Amino acid sequence: MATLFIADLHLCVEEPAITAGFLRFLAGEARNADALYILGDLFEAWIGDDDPNPLHRQMAAAIKAVSDSGVPCYFIHGNRDFLLGKRFARESDMTLLPEEKVLELYGRRVLIMHGDTLCTDDAGYQAFRAKVHNPWLQTLFLALPLFVRKRIAARMRANSKEANSSKSLAIMDVNQNAVVSAMEKHQVQWLIHGHTHRPAVHELIANQQPAFRVVLGAWHTEGSMVKVTADDVELIHFPF
C-alpha cells in the first residue's frame, strides 16, 4: 500500500482536461491508497464555500467517493484556495490540516506543507500573504456579495500575474535556510511540498543528517504525485 500526495492542480472551468485527469486519478490510483493528501491549490481560486460553481460540487462529490471507498482524504490550504472552509470539507469528507503537518509514514517522519511559506526571499508576496491571512479581513471579505468577491479575486489574480512577471525565478523559489529551519523545527529528514511548480527531489543536510525535499509538480499537461511506501518515496509524473 502507499500514501499519495498531490498539489497545484489549479482546477477551473477553463481547463477541462485537468479536471478530467483528476477525476480519472480519483477513480483509479487514489482508490488503492492508504490515504490521499492534497497540499494546496486544488483550485485556481476560492472565494467562499457558498460559491455555486458546479465544478466545486463535482469535485466535492468525487473526493467524497474516494473517502467513502475507505481512503481518508486530507487537505492543506494553498495560496489560491486558502479560503476553502469547513462546509466544502464536510461535503467532500476531507480533513483540513494546519499549514505544517508532520506524518509518521512507514517508519519515516515526513513534514508536509503547501510550500509558499518557504519562499521567504519574495518579501512582497510574504507581506501580501500576511494580510490576506488576517482572520478579520477574511471574515469581511466573505461577508461581501458573491459578485463583489469575484471581481476582487479577478483583480488580485491579475495583479499577482503582473507582479510575478517581473520577479526573478530565484526569488519565487524556496529559501534554503527556511527549508532547513522548518525541517529542524519539526525534527524531520523528509519534506514534501508544492507551490513552486518545480518538481524535483533535492538532497540537503538537516539535523546534521542527510535529508530530502520532494517538490510536487503542477498539473498542466500531465499529472504529478508523490507516492510513499515502506520501501520508497517516488516523485511520479503520469499522463491525464
UniProtKB/Swiss-Prot annotation:
Chain sites annotated for binding Mn(2+) 1: D8, H10, D41, H197
Gene Ontology MF terms in the entry: manganese ion binding; UDP-2,3-diacylglucosamine hydrolase activity
Gene Ontology process terms (BP): lipid A biosynthetic process
Binding site for Mn(2+) 2: D41, N79, H114, H195
Keyword Zinc listed: no
Record keyword Nucleus present: no
Pathway participation: Glycolipid biosynthesis; lipid IV(A) biosynthesis; lipid IV(A) from (3R)-3-hydroxytetradecanoyl-[acyl-carrier-protein] and UDP-N-acetyl-alpha-D-glucosamine: step 4/6
Class in the EC hierarchy, top level: hydrolase
Cofactor needs: Mn(2+)
Family of the protein in this entry: Belongs to the LpxH family.
Binding residues for substrate: N79, R80, D122, S160, N164, K167, H195
Alphabetical list of Gene3D superfamilies matching this protein: 3.60.21.10
Entry keywords, A to Z: Cell inner membrane, Cell membrane, Hydrolase, Lipid A biosynthesis, Lipid biosynthesis, Lipid metabolism, Manganese, Membrane, Metal-binding
Cofactor note (record): Binds 2 Mn(2+) ions per subunit in a binuclear metal center.
Role of this protein: Hydrolyzes the pyrophosphate bond of UDP-2,3-diacylglucosamine to yield 2,3-diacylglucosamine 1-phosphate (lipid X) and UMP by catalyzing the attack of water at the alpha-P atom. Involved in the biosynthesis of lipid A, a phosphorylated glycolipid that anchors the lipopolysaccharide to the outer membrane of the cell.
Reactions catalysed: UDP-2-N,3-O-bis[(3R)-3-hydroxytetradecanoyl]-alpha-D-glucosamine + H2O = 2-N,3-O-bis[(3R)-3-hydroxytetradecanoyl]-alpha-D-glucosaminyl 1-phosphate + UMP + 2 H(+)
HAMAP family: LpxH (MF_00575)
EC id: 3.6.1.54
A Pfam family this chain is assigned to: Metallophos
Subcellular location: Cell inner membrane
Membrane topology per record: Peripheral membrane protein
Protein name: UDP-2,3-diacylglucosamine hydrolase
Superkingdom of the organism of origin: Bacteria
A single cellular component GO annotation: cytoplasm
Species: Shigella dysenteriae serotype 1 (strain Sd197)
Database matches in CDD domains: MPP_YbbF-LpxH (cd07398)
